[in-house]
Amino acid sequence: MITVKTIDRAHRNDINIKNQPFPLFGQMLPSYNGGKWEYEIKRFTEENNTETCFPDENYDYDKLSANSVFVGAYDGDECIGLAILQQAMLKYMYLYDLKVNTNYRGKHIGTMLIEKSKEIALEQGYRGIYTQGQDNNLGACLFYLKNGFVIGGLDTHVYTGTSQEGKSDILFYLDINK
């Protein structure tokens, strides 16, 4: 049985679960028209589908815990999913990281982490959660939309001068106290 709970200091090593590969099979193309965000989906051809993996982080629980909350999804004692929420200046708590072990994807673990994150954000006085996803990580973008997030912005400059140049970050917002 999967349980979702806040990760305390005694379980601090759980915040460093390994990143695992995910497929790149399309791109979300947002546009802002008439005061409303819309998007199109560009699917890659089968031969252009690829897989990528983010570098592993080395999160320091003691340093981050001053302004972060860690949420873990557990199968028994094994942490198989992680959400990191960070304090933010405005009314939306920032979902800094969200990841689920490859063997558990498609089993609603990410949604369970979002649900617990919503509880935490409300308890801390936020009206919602925001996060960002790369436009070419179509699986993540569609996941956020499926879980009630809406597009709230587009950063087309963030990767300029890096190996990721040409990509954009889509900002997603979830209102939870409507």
Model-derived regions: residue spans:
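C-terminal "cap" of GNAT-fold acetyltransferases
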Residues: 134-137, 147-150, 157-178
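Conserved GNAT acetyl-CoA-binding A-motif
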Residues: 121-133
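Acetyl-CoA-dependent GNAT
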Residues: 9-10, 17-92, 96, 101-102, ...
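Extreme N-terminal starter segment of soluble prokaryotic enzymes
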Residues: 1-3
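Conserved acetyl-CoA-binding loop-helix of GNAT-fold acetyltransferases
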Residues: 100, 106-119, 142-146
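Structural motif
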Residues: 124, 146-147
